[in-house]
Curated annotation (Swiss-Prot):
Residues 4-235 form the ABC transporter domain. It is found in: Cell inner membrane. The gene is ugpC. This is sn-glycerol-3-phosphate import ATP-binding protein UgpC. InterPro entries: AAA+_ATPase, ABC_transporter-like_ATP-bd, ABC_transporter-like_CS, ABC_transpr_MalK-like, ABC_transpr_MalK/UgpC-like, Mo/tungstate-bd_C_term_dom, NA-bd_OB-fold, OB_MalK-like. It comes from Burkholderia pseudomallei (strain 1710b). ATP binds at residues 37-44. One of its GO terms (biological process) is glycerophosphodiester transmembrane transport. Keywords: ATP-binding, Cell inner membrane, Cell membrane, Membrane, Nucleotide-binding, Sugar transport, Translocase, Transport. SUPFAM superfamilies: MOP-like, P-loop containing nucleoside triphosphate hydrolases.
């Protein structure tokens, strides 16, 4: 195990255009960090640079205090788990898991011992004599993880390992990865576009956008205090409602651009440095919009309602803005019905319209 450090890491492909812009992060020994963002944000490129599969244009990557920029992947003491399992079809599970050690010249007895230990951790013991075609998708991914475990690396790198699995298997594998990290406590960097994976697996999340680390923090902090409108719209399902408009002079109402005046339950700017009487992007999460007894509320004409099982999502519009409200299971408004909706000051987020950055 080892700490991982990235200092001013940048990447370009021979021109002035950078695809990664000065990434700085220190990952502690044993920490599980998730790189999350949409396609093209640079998360997989950054992971490949850590692995040594891409060169570093500028900056420094260090593993265990040793700068690895010039080292080949095999010399970095890392193990990688890919989206595609990359198993040899003619080999058994045991042979697949131990093959990396075999080509490194590790003694057969040690290979067998490590394979057996990894198989016990991943519950692969009964499958060791099978070939990949005889395995389910989840079992194949466990074999790929086992192949990484037997190397006993300083750092695990996961490149969207669950993308090929169905929804039920993804949930199961998330739990298995959590248990694996709790048991091994190996420094891990995990790439995904799925914010549910990011929120459930990470000790810290790095939200990537257009080659920048938009926000770095614990999942709960990123969710509760998004640093930018991008993070607010990307983290959370459904996304945070973002409304362009103006906060009234007394902070008691918000005038939505080309939309209604919405009463605010409490003083919106109190103690937060939110200037009244100016333009803001106001954010509020769908689960925070159900009015409490005695709170001021607005109304929303329901366009549609999604029945999700444990809860429901009502959708409508204020001006040009789509609005989603999370409701209890028993509330199922129909199209055209008017829904009371609150904007509680304690749950409001304000962003600068010019920069998209959080205020207060």
């Amino acid at each position: 195990m080892a700490a991982l450090s990235l200092k001013g890491v940048r990447k370009s492909y021979g021109g002035a255009q950078y695809v990664l812009h000065g990434i700085d992060v220190d990952i502690a020994d044993g920490e599980f960090v998730v790189l999350v963002g949409p396609s093209g944000c640079g998360k997989s490129t950054l992971l490949r640079m850590i692995a040594g599969l891409e060169t570093v244009t500028e900056g420094e990557i260090a593993i265990g205090g040793r700068v690895v920029n010039a080292l080949e992947p095999k010399d970095r003491d890392i193990a990688m788990v890919f989206q595609n399992y990359a198993l040899y079809p003619h080999m058994t599970v045991a042979q697949n898991m131990g093959y990396g050690l075999k080509i490194r010249g590790v003694e057969r007895a040690l290979i067998d011992a490590r394979v057996q230990a990894a198989a016990q951790i991943l519950e692969l013991g009964p499958l060791l004599a099978r070939r990949p075609r005889e395995l389910s998708g989840g079992q194949r991914q466990r074999v790929a993880m086992g192949r990484a475990i037997v190397r006993e690396p300083s750092v695990f790198l996961f490149d969207e390992p669950l993308s090929n699995l169905d929804a039920k298997l993804r949930v199961q594998m998330r739990l298995e990865i959590q248990r694996l990290h709790a048991r091994l406590a190996t420094t891990s960097v995990y790439v995904t576009h799925d914010q549910i994976e990011a929120m459930t697996l990470a000790q810290r999340v790095i939200v990537m956008n257009r080659g920048y680390a938009e926000q770095i923090g614990a999942p709960v902090d990123v969710y509760e205090k998004p640093a930018t409108t991008f993070v607010a719209s990307f983290i959370g399902s459904p996304a945070m409602n973002l409304l362009h408009g103006r906060l009234s002079e007394d902070g008691a109402a918000f005038d939505v651009a080309d939309g209604p005046r919405l009463p605010v339950a409490g003083s919106a700017g109190a103690g937060r440095g939110i200037a009244p009487g100016r333009e803001w992007i106001l954010g509020v999460r769908p689960e925070h919009m159900t009015p409490q007894p005695g709170e001021a509320f607005a109304t929303l004409a329901v366009d549609s309602c999604e029945l999700l099982g444990a809860d429901n999502l009502a959708h409508g519009r204020w001006g040009a803005h789509d609005v989603a409200v999370r409701l209890p299971h028993a509330m199922r408004p129909t199209r055209g019905e008017t829904l009371p909706v609150a904007l509680p000051a304690r749950h409001l987020h304000f962003f600068d319209p010019a920069t998209g950055k959080r205020a207060g």
